[in-house]
């Protein structure tokens, strides 16, 4: 007989809860890793009895703290520790990027496990990423190999969405930028991940947009509890309950599509007809899993979690960087007209949009989504090439400081839309380095090493499709009275979520 265990929580005596807390604390002490000897840049100050103030200083001023930390250790190890909202982390100079890019004892999966409670119900989208290679295989092979097949459908979706949400109004009118860019990216991504039957489903779009944020908030809620109590606490914490409900809703939306396709395939086999193939992630995941079990809803949410908010942020920042640069917008229009004068989307289209590629890469360089990347957890004590020791259990990140280094980029604090285009001129040996999809220690917008974002080729294609439609179909500028500012919180940087732009429909010179 099934028993609802939730009411049991109310029956715990206070002394029992205290006992569990004490036991969990003892467990942490007994299993704790040995302490790092690296300097701490934002420890407790005099008369501070905890690290709450240190966390506040980190959230408000992480960029300066990391810059100061790198300056302090530049003549020694090039590594230091910093108190974050999730505990103490080790920050490495970008000079270590090659050291750790493929180190067998430094694990991305282990870092995700420590950060995201993957064994608790509701966090299934993270769990399928760290416990299986299906997602990574699907993105690296099927998604990247099918870019030519999915570009035209994304363009069709952009036409539908812009007409509906950006409208054909030829008068200047103000719109909130983030909801507009989020709508584009969510719908274009969903067209690729789930096909045309689901990509415009408002319930799916709501879930796919909200699950990422809600799961991060749920993870933050759980971190307030001792680790041993988190599975119990997750039963009643509001955000944890919310993401479990979203996962169930996702299953209810996706499973009928899978069932319908399975029946159609069985019928085709019965009649001796060829089975219909689909250019979407439902098909690719099924092909990649073969005999392996998988959770379709969790995997679809994993794809959305990885793709939507990151691409939305870069699209929004790029649009803001274009605002007020009318000559640059005209240059981009001329490039688009030149590329599309002889036809539509084909294998060479994305490569030919070199100025657009440079603009996006420069937007990402000036304002990436984080000032430190390459998160890894040491699964053993790790000795780096210069002798620096990373203790077992320590989570490390690599600073992105070379992205603003004057020795790498002249006038690094200035947005130069032609910076990477100039590197791709005939005879240059920087053609590969200068492309948007090329990660390096000098440009870690998509990370670096074997865990560099596997979906960066798709993201680049999606961004270019969206920008082609926006640039050709609309005039746009920052709305009167709006002064967009980068939102900073800890190591995270976000395009101004409250920014408004003024837009008006224009007659495009080419159609897609």
Curated annotation (Swiss-Prot):
Identify the EC number(s).
1.-.-.-
Q: Which GO terms describe its cellular component?
A: membrane
What Gene3D superfamilies does the database record attribute to this sequence? Cytochrome P450 (1.10.630.10)
InterPro entries hit by this protein: Cyt_P450, Cyt_P450_CS, Cyt_P450_E_grp-IV, Cyt_P450_sf
PROSITE patterns the UniProt entry points to: CYTOCHROME_P450
| Glycosylation positions in this chain | 86, 149, 210
Q: Where in the cell is it found?
A: Membrane
The residue ranges crossing the membrane are 12-32
Give the record's membrane topology: Single-pass membrane protein
Q: What is its main location?
A: membrane
Look up the record and name the pathway of this protein.
Secondary metabolite biosynthesis; terpenoid biosynthesis
Q: Which residues bind heme?
A: 453
**Looking at the record's lineage, which domain of life comes first?**
Eukaryota
Which cofactors does this gene product need? Answer: heme
List the GO biological process terms.
mycotoxin biosynthetic process; terpenoid biosynthetic process
Keywords on record: Glycoprotein, Heme, Iron, Membrane, Metal-binding, Monooxygenase, Oxidoreductase, Transmembrane, Transmembrane helix
Stored Pfam families = p450
Drop me one GO molecular function for this one.
heme binding
PANTHER family per the record? Answer: CYTOCHROME P450, CYTOCHROME P450 MONOOXYGENASE AUSG-RELATED
Q: Which family does it belong to?
A: Belongs to the cytochrome P450 family.
Function text: Cytochrome P450 monooxygenase; part of the gene cluster that mediates the biosynthesis of andrastins, meroterpenoid compounds that exhibit inhibitory activity against ras farnesyltransferase, suggesting that they could be promising leads for antitumor agents. The first step of the pathway is the synthesis of 3,5-dimethylorsellinic acid (DMOA) by the polyketide synthase adrD via condensation of one acetyl-CoA starter unit with 3 malonyl-CoA units and 2 methylations. DMAO is then converted to farnesyl-DMAO by the prenyltransferase adrG.
Q: What is this protein called?
A: Cytochrome P450 monooxygenase adrA
